[in-house]
């Protein structure tokens, strides 16, 4: 029974962090509403080859990530749990791979479970793993690729080694079909330092074609199918989504080279105290511990690769956290009390700092000129304070006996995990989580023949909630500019200066609803035709125009 306790503890972490809260969290726009709607449309249409978003061609990503979400919605229905489940499931599988690789590297089950728990409870991993985006899926395939490569290079010559390289190729192929060519580049860059240090070039050249075969065999059927259906897909996907995003000055999400340093530091909480020592030890042992050096390359090379990219988002470095968890678990097992005590102090201070920030800055009575919470949200303030008090309390608990209790740090994010969905300020909900607003005005929306929105994310929320993909865009095209450029999408977008004339004619055919997300700080809508009904909540406004009989 004693030997089962670590495994049970890991399963409890996964359940409490990644499964229990999912049903109680609204969808964020634009990301979560986007991916929810794309998969809903795939299931509704039966077309799993060409991605469509609001009925328009959407070529920003390949299809496998959507397929995972499709299966989730098919299994769990039209629910927020289903939308989030694909990400959480991918993180859980990656945690299992972390455990497996620890067994292969060090033959230590306890160390493997510790590494999996560290991975699952890292702040960045948890934040992304409960957020409906595709990054957990690509992290899963990259972890599978790195595990397959390690299995291959450790296997004796023959069919087992070949099978390992074939599995590497399959994982890379699935990664390519999830997020593109980075799934091919990142594993190559990650293993490069180890291959050079171990002088394994000959083996890679001999067995590498098997990996290439696996990748091609996995992805080629879909590659051909979408090229036949949509000949322009590969031009857009390669040039816009790869070349421009990585290299051009007008790339999306531009950030400086050092952007990922603070992201890494914050993302490793509640294990930040272990980070410097784990990296330092792996570097010092690069000559004697080939496994540790393999993990170090897996951490550092993707970080450098994405730091060189012009476009940056915190989610991009998620693949580096699996090897980082392994290195930190190994370091913690032998580092002694000092680093473990530092880790506890950092968690205590972080929790207290966040408590002070929520209670004295963000609260209605706080120091901020425009507090995040308003007067009737004291309950939410208290929930936020309680969530971070749990973090501080667990940090303090580990300080009582650092060498014995340090693993309890995995429980630091528990309060946030269980309470954050109930502590979101209303002004944030009214701008970033449109589901509640949509449900309030649902009767007006359901009787509208035409529905417009001036935000792609809000439009996606409307489509998801109403289960209709014909939501059109008003004034701003955003990420759907490419899909709207096709002739068959000409009636799916209207500019503000044309709206009055369009409205005069189309109101003869049916009611019109326009949902506007006001710019931050703007309070009036005086430049649009007067609506028959108006409803406003925060920055979201519904303008309803009734049908006019000819």
UniProtKB/Swiss-Prot annotation:
UniProt-listed GO biological process terms: lipid A biosynthetic process; lipopolysaccharide biosynthetic process; protein O-linked glycosylation; response to iron(III) ion
Membrane topology designation: Multi-pass membrane protein
Cellular-component GO terms for this entry: plasma membrane
Q: Which reaction does it catalyse?
A: 4-amino-4-deoxy-alpha-L-arabinopyranosyl di-trans,octa-cis-undecaprenyl phosphate + lipid IVA = lipid IIA + di-trans,octa-cis-undecaprenyl phosphate
One term of GO molecular function: 4-amino-4-deoxy-L-arabinose transferase activity
What top-level class of enzyme does the UniProt entry assign?
transferase
Q: What is its main location?
A: membrane
Please list every transmembrane segment annotated in the UniProt record, as residue ranges: 4-24, 81-101, 110-132, 176-196, 204-224, 255-275, 288-308, 313-333, 348-368, 381-401, 409-429
Quote the pathway field: Lipopolysaccharide metabolism; 4-amino-4-deoxy-beta-L-arabinose-lipid A biosynthesis
Q: Does the keyword Magnesium apply?
A: no
Source organism, top-level taxon: Bacteria
Which keywords, in A-to-Z order, does the entry hold?
A: Cell inner membrane, Cell membrane, Glycosyltransferase, Lipid A biosynthesis, Lipid biosynthesis, Lipid metabolism, Lipopolysaccharide biosynthesis, Membrane, Transferase, Transmembrane, Transmembrane helix
Q: What is its EC number?
A: 2.4.2.43
| Compartments where found | Cell inner membrane
Question: What is the protein's known function?
Answer: Catalyzes the transfer of the L-Ara4N moiety of the glycolipid undecaprenyl phosphate-alpha-L-Ara4N to lipid A. The modified arabinose is attached to lipid A and is required for resistance to polymyxin and cationic antimicrobial peptides.
Which family, according to UniProt?
Belongs to the glycosyltransferase 83 family.
What is the recorded name of this protein?
A: Undecaprenyl phosphate-alpha-4-amino-4-deoxy-L-arabinose arabinosyl transferase 2
Species, as recorded: Sodalis glossinidius (strain morsitans)
Q: What is the lineage of its organism?
A: Bacteria, Pseudomonadati, Pseudomonadota, Gammaproteobacteria, Enterobacterales
């Amino acid at each position: 029974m004693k030997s089962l306790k670590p495994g049970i503890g890991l399963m409890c972490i996964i359940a409490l962090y990644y499964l229990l809260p999912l049903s109680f969290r609204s969808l964020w726009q634009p990301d979560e509403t986007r991916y929810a709607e794309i998969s809903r449309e795939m299931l509704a249409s039966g077309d799993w080859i060409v991605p469509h978003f609001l009925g328009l061609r959407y070529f920003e990503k390949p299809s496998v990530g959507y397929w995972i979400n499709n299966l989730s919605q098919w299994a769990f229905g039209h629910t927020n749990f289903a939308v989030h489940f694909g990400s959480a499931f991918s993180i859980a599988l990656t945690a299992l791979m972390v455990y497996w690789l620890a067994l292969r590297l060090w033959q230590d089950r306890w160390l493997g479970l510790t590494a999996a728990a560290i991975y699952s409870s890292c702040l960045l991993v948890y934040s992304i793993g409960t957020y409906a985006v595709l990054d957990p899926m690509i992290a899963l395939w990259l972890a599978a690729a790195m595990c397959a490569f390690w299995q291959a290079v450790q296997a004796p010559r023959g069919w087992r080694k070949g099978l390992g390289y074939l599995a590497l190729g399959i994982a890379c192929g699935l990664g390519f079909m999830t997020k593109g060519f980075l799934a091919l580049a990142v594993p190559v860059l990650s293993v490069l330092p180890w291959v050079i240090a171990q002088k394994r070039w000959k083996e890679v050249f001999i067995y590498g074609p098997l990996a290439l075969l696996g990748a091609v065999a996995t992805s080629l059927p879909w590659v051909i199918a979408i090229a036949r259906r949509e000949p322009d897909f590969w031009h857009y996907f390669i040039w816009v989504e790869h070349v421009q995003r990585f290299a051009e000055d007008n790339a999306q999400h531009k950030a400086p080279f050092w952007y990922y340093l603070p992201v890494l530091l914050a993302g490793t909480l509640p294990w930040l105290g272990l980070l410097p020592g784990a990296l330092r030890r792996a570097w010092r042992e690069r000559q004697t511990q080939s496994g540790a050096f393999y993990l170090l390359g897996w951490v550092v090379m993707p970080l450098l690769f994405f730091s060189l990219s012009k476009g940056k988002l915190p989610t991009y470095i998620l693949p580096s956290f699996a090897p980082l968890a392994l290195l930190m678990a190994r370091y913690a097992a032998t580092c002694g009390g000092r680093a473990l005590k530092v880790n506890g102090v950092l968690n205590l201070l972080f929790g207290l700092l966040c408590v002070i920030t929520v209670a004295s800055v963000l609260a209605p009575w706080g120091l901020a000129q425009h507090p995040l919470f308003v007067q009737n949200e004291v309950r939410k303030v208290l929930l936020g304070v309680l969530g971070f008090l749990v973090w501080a309390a667990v940090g303090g608990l580990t300080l009582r006996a650092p060498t014995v209790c340090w693993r309890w740090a995995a429980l630091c994010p528990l309060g946030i995990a269980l309470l954050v969905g109930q502590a979101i300020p209303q002004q944030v909900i009214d701008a970033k989580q449109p589901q509640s607003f949509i449900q309030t005005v649902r009767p007006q929306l359901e009787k509208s023949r035409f529905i417009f929105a001036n935000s792609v994310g809000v439009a996606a929320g409307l489509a998801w909630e109403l289960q209709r993909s014909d939501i059109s865009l008003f004034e701003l095209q955003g990420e759907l500019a490419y899909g709207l450029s096709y002739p068959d999408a000409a009636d799916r977008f209207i500019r503000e200066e044309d709206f009055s004339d369009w409205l005069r004619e189309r109101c003869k055919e049916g009611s019109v609803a326009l949902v506007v997300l006001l710019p931050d700080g703007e309070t009036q809508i005086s430049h649009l035709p007067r609506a028959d009904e108006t409803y406003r909540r925060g920055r979201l406004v519904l303008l309803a125009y009734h049908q006019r009989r000819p």
